[in-house]
Amino acid sequence: MANFNVPKLGVFPVAAVFDIDNVPEDSSATGSRWLPSIYQGGNYWGGGPQALHAQVSNFDSSNRLPYNPRTENNPAGNCAFAFNPFGQYISNISSAQSVHRRIYGIDLNDEPLFSPNAASITNGGNPTMSQDTGYHNIGPINTAYKAEIFRPVNPLPMSDTAPDPETLEPGQTEPLIKSDGVYSNSGIASFIFDRPVTEPNPNWPPLPPPVIPIIYPTPALGIGAAAAYGFGYQVTVYRWEEIPVEFIADPETCPAQPTTDKVIIRTTDLNPEGSPCAYEAGIILVRQTSNPMNAVAGRLVPYVEDIAVDIFLTGKFFTLNPPLRITNNYFADDEVKENTVTIGNYTTTLSSAYYAVYKTDGYGGATCFIASGGAGISALVQLQDNSVLDVLYYSLPLSLGGSKAAIDEWVANNCGLFPMSGGLDKTTLLEIPRRQLEAINPQDGPGQYDLFILDDSGAYASFSSFIGYPEAAYYVAGAATFMDVENPDEIIFILRNGAGWYACEIGDALKIADDEFDSVDYFAYRGGVMFIGSARYTEGGDPLPIKYRAIIPGLPRGRLPRVVLEYQAVGMSFIPCQTHCLGKGGIISKV
């Protein structure tokens, strides 16, 4: 399996990502397991790293690797953790303080490296979920670049201590943890700087070597000076390659030597489940169903790929939030009643939560669901057509004051589903056609729950004004976006500016004719990349055009493309940020 160091200061990391679309799921009590990988930062609804420990234990042991806490007899435990490209350790590991000091020489009593209340900027000014717990966590806006982990049965514990080689399980030849560093299979967590780029925090870890990052200024655009920061890193992608399985009945002996081209399983009357003969340790055996003769095998083959990312920064903060993948195989088709929310492989409990599976893939995996609770609402959304945006999810915390109109709209726009009852009843969902969208006939005086007919089929979508940011000197007038999944280069924008609705394609000039509403919010999908932009018109009068486009190289699946956002505007403030904040800019790209 892949090993990589949690980086020391100034060391750029190498992550491991597993391309596991074709990896079979193991439904038996033997075979492989998904390793719980806690990639959310310290304070994402859970109250800090320590609180995450209790939540990890909620994994279904029949489908997940059980969480083994650190004990006197098991000092290592099974602790998965995450890190970010600049070396800041944001862990759920129980020895977080000592590891902080040992690896980074950081005194936890010093000024935090990251803003403990950064989330309040994008959570409508509500810092409820962003209190600092002493672990330099970054609040609830740290959705991470999720690495899918596929492990053999009985994996070694993840720890900052080297395991005794004598404790290795049969067939395991190399420990995942070494004494000269901490190894993880977790991926890259997102990060937020709490100072403007012109005032670097002396406590920040040094930037990577100059050959990797490129820092170049851009002109000031209305509110504060903006800059763009580009960097790159390598990702080891493990792809599943299947190996034939041969069943033999009542053999006298197994082959003398392990084989690398197939797995031999011998079955007897006393053991119809069968037991595999010795084979190469790198082969993973998966028993898919209760039928003992239904088993597959394969290996994960590594490929190193380069990733390049451009980040646009401005003013107070910036963050990188690449997409994550949800692999839960225990989502039921029916509404889930428990007061828990699972995001990726992370489970937590909300103070007052409800969520429903809006759509499943037919195998128990959710393709679209929402969760809400407390002062924030999170929607994890996947577009229907994986061939367009792959498995693009993103989280959208909102302060809605009890209104779920924006969530309804998000589900409608991004999932092609709309709960006609206005509630979380999946039985009332209607499919929204993604073609013939030009036939929108808005009603007079649109409101949050007004329905707009899309075509003659009777399907509906809801539109609403999303959320206001008066403290940021601009607000969102409201928008919605649809995409033709068969032709992703043709995107239709539906913009409300007080005078009516407008539809146009990407690259066209967007105009506002009514100076009563001086801002516009829009989404755009193109070539598998979504970016959110917001513009404020600083003076009324003639309409001011906005031109923008995303240049997305045609990279294969498994690559994070280099994204260059070109923009040209007059009297416009372009405020890029992470994907969570509606009304501000940002980009996310597919894995």
From Swiss-Prot:
Specify whether Disulfide bond is a keyword of the entry.
yes
The Gene Ontology CC terms held by the record are:
virion component
Disulfide connectivity for this sequence is C254-C277
Its lineage reads: Viruses, Varidnaviria, Bamfordvirae, Preplasmiviricota, Tectiliviricetes
UniProt subcellular location: Virion
Q: Which organism is it from?
A: Enterobacteria phage PRD1
Q: Which domain of life is it from?
A: Viruses
Q: What's this protein's function?
A: Adsorption protein. In association with P31 and trimeric P5, forms the spike complexes located at the 5-fold vertices of the capsid. Involved in recognition and attachment to the receptor on the surface of the host. Likely triggers the processes of vertex disassembly, membrane tube formation, and subsequent DNA injection. Essential for viral infectivity.
What protein name applies here? Answer: Adsorption protein P2
Provide the GO biological process annotations: symbiont entry into host cell; virion attachment to host cell
Output the InterPro entries linked to this UniProt entry: P2_sf, Phage_PRD1_P2, Phage_PRD1_P2_C, Phage_PRD1_P2_N
Per UniProt, the keywords (alphabetical) are: Disulfide bond, Host-virus interaction, Viral attachment to host cell, Virion, Virus entry into host cell
Pfam families in the record: Prd1-P2 (PF09214)
